[in-house]
Regions:
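Glycine-biased, small-residue-rich flexible motifs in mid-sequence functional cores and linkers
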Residues: 1-219
Length: 219
């Protein structure tokens, strides 16, 4: 992970943990381990989903055995669909990503190059009807190429950590939810957009369309 990714991931995981939200990741090098560690350091809970068996002989990476012992405590949980003694394979990591997204209310991609397995997790999340957030990054940085691409494809850009905390805790509607029988509003579309942005801060076009039930060309 880059210094930028490390700082952002730490802030996100800590904020979620302090809000009582469980952080789920894959206990791999980089962003995964930062997410788990930051959640635990903040006094929160975390779940690690492995692409191998959960026994010491199979768990990978071996360098993360101390982290695994820390997660496997009062505030954490390690799970796997693979039996003890099953080593990680090239295909087991992408396969476990569907579990990471499946047990999560939202998926956040902090850093990813264009071929990153994190993009598989994002696709799984969309297929499962979950919200997908991506952290924007420099157009010159390869590890932001995947996240910037996700945003271009419609993922919600994560600009304010408070936004996802509020959404997961239920004080904001899911990006995938459409308003049910919204009350009539006589304000002009422009006034409604200004009001919405003043209440929630910067929003992706898709979120504006979903919230105001207008078409993209109108917005």
């Amino acid at each position: 992970a880059s210094p930028y990714g490390t700082e952002v991931c730490g802030m996100i995981a800590s904020s979620l943990a302090q809000a009582g939200i469980t952080v789920v990741s894959g206990m791999a090098f980089g962003i995964d381990s930062i997410a788990h560690t930051s959640a635990l350091d903040a006094g929160g809970s975390t779940i690690a989903v492995l692409g191998s068996g959960i026994d010491n002989a199979s768990m990978t990476p071996r360098e993360h055995e101390p982290l695994g012992r820390r997660i496997d405590g009062p505030k954490g949980l390690i799970i796997s669909e693979y039996a003890p003694g099953s080593p990680a394979t090239k295909g087991s990591y992408p396969a476990r990503n569907r579990i990471i997204s499946g047990i999560s209310q939202a998926t956040i991609i902090v850093e990813a190059d264009i071929k990153s397995g994190s993009l598989i997790t994002a696709k799984c999340a969309l297929d499962q009807g979950r919200d997908v957030y991506a952290v924007p990054g420099s157009i010159f940085w390869p590890r932001s190429e995947g996240t910037n691409w996700l945003i271009a494809q419609g993922a919600h850009p994560l600009l304010h950590i408070e936004e996802i905390v509020e959404r997961i805790n239920g004080t904001q509607p899911s990006l995938l939810e459409s308003p049910v029988n919204p009350a009539p509003n006589n304000d002009s579309l422009e006034e409604r957009i200004v009001t919405l942005l003043s209440q929630r801060g910067p929003l992706h076009m898709d979120a504006i369309v979903e919230t105001l039930t207008c078409s993209a060309p109108e917005a």
